[in-house]
């Protein structure tokens, strides 16, 4: 049987991957399932099931069957502000499956905020102090990974916005007017562009439109495909483009 130290080291390996591989909450849940020997569910603050791993199937399990758990379930989880150990039939009295299981609920916190919930379930055997130590350590690791995931998302959003702003900055006045009218005409993330129609509307040459599109395509903001006489199919690859163009209207 693995000792508490050996189990803690297994959980710690998750941290060793931080920054090297994308966050995989299913893998994290699987490791916690193995060391704690329980069903494990990792949920976001809004009740989205980020990852889970099943040791034993107990039937109609709301945590495993839903991408987002019902709001009333999540509200109950969020009201748990410190580890709730070995709950049986109190937290989810109305749920026939969960009320028959032994549940341990561990809040996931980070940066002073509630980030989510780590939920564990068993059929008969209660969670020991060692199990709770591993669960709380696991919740800390989950919190760090959620924070990292959020930071990566923020950085990616900032990078995409910067690329769009730089590309817009390279446009001449005529090219900028062409871009504004192109995406006003598309009215979405993709569609068919008839360059001559835009040229006549704005009072510019087709070459101005072509140059503007080339700049955006080389920046990886859009992709275009000629359909001959029908026009050009445009697809937005960077969703920050539409946001930045919308700001210009204000």
Curated annotation (Swiss-Prot):
Question: Where does this protein bind DNA?
Answer: 195-214
Q: Which organism is it from?
A: Thermoanaerobacter pseudethanolicus (strain ATCC 33223 / 39E)
Instruction: Quote the function comment for this protein.
Output: DNA-binding global transcriptional regulator which is involved in the adaptive response to starvation and acts by directly or indirectly controlling the expression of numerous genes in response to nutrient availability. During rapid exponential growth, CodY is highly active and represses genes whose products allow adaptation to nutrient depletion.
- Superkingdom: Bacteria
Q: What is the lineage of its organism?
A: Bacteria, Bacillati, Bacillota, Clostridia, Thermoanaerobacterales
Gene name of the encoded protein: codY
Family as reported in the entry's similarity comment: Belongs to the CodY family.
Question: What pairs make up the disulfide bonds?
Answer: none
Q: By what name is this protein known?
A: Global transcriptional regulator CodY
- Name the keywords, alphabetized: Cytoplasm, DNA-binding, Repressor, Transcription, Transcription regulation
Q: Which Gene3D superfamilies match?
A: 3.30.450.40, Winged helix-like DNA-binding domain superfamily/Winged helix DNA-binding domain
Query: Where is it located?
Result: Cytoplasm
Stretches the record annotates as GAF domain: 1-147
Name any Gene Ontology BP term. Answer: negative regulation of DNA-templated transcription
Q: Which GO terms describe its molecular function?
A: DNA binding; DNA-binding transcription factor activity; GTP binding
Please classify the protein's predominant subcellular localization into one broad category.
cytoplasm
